[in-house]
C-alpha cells in the first residue's frame, strides 16, 4: 500500500473502478452469450430480440471506453451475420 495520502486515495479509487469495470464487462459478455445461445436454438425471433438488447449494451460500453469501438462493431457484425443466416 502507498504511503502518500493522495497515492492511497488513487489506489482505492483504482480498485473501485477495476471492480466496476469487471462487473460491466461480465454483464456485457452475458448479453453476448445470450445471443449466441438464441442463434444456436435456431429461433430467429428470439435471436433478433436478444441481439437488440446486446447491441444497446455493447454500444454503451464502447461509448464509455470499456471496450474499443471496433471490438463492439466486430461483435455486432459477427452476430448479425449469424442471425441473417437463420432466415
UniProtKB/Swiss-Prot annotation:
Alphabetical UniProt keywords: Ribonucleoprotein, Ribosomal protein, RNA-binding, rRNA-binding
Superkingdom, natural source: Bacteria
InterPro entries to which the protein is assigned, alphabetical: Ribosomal_bS20, Ribosomal_bS20_sf
Gene3D superfamilies with a match to the protein in the record: Ribosomal protein S20
Transmembrane segments: none
Cellular component GO terms, alphabetical: cytosol; small ribosomal subunit
Chain intervals for the UniProt region annotation (Disordered): 1-26
SUPFAM superfamilies referenced in this protein's UniProt entry, alphabetically: Ribosomal protein S20 (SSF46992)
Disulfide bonds: none
One Pfam match: Ribosomal_S20p
GO process terms (BP): translation
GO function terms (MF aspect): small ribosomal subunit rRNA binding; structural constituent of ribosome
Family, similarity comment: Belongs to the bacterial ribosomal protein bS20 family.
Role summary: Binds directly to 16S ribosomal RNA.
NCBIfam families for this protein: S20 (TIGR00029)
Protein name (record): Small ribosomal subunit protein bS20
Organism, scientific name: Glaesserella parasuis serovar 5 (strain SH0165) (Haemophilus parasuis)
Amino acid at each position: 500500500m502507498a504511503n502518500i495520502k493522495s497515492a492511497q486515495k488513487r489506489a482505492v479509487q483504482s480498485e473501485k473502478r477495476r471492480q466496476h469495470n469487471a462487473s460491466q464487462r461480465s454483464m456485457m459478455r452475458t448479453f453476448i452469450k445470450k445471443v449466441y445461445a438464441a442463434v444456436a436454438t435456431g429461433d430467429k425471433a428470439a435471436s433478433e430480440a436478444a441481439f437488440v438488447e446486446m447491441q444497446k449494451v455493447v454500444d454503451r460500453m464502447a461509448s464509455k471506453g470499456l471496450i474499443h469501438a471496433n471490438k463492439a462493431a466486430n461483435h455486432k457484425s459477427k452476430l448479425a451475420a449469424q442471425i441473417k443466416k437463420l432466415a
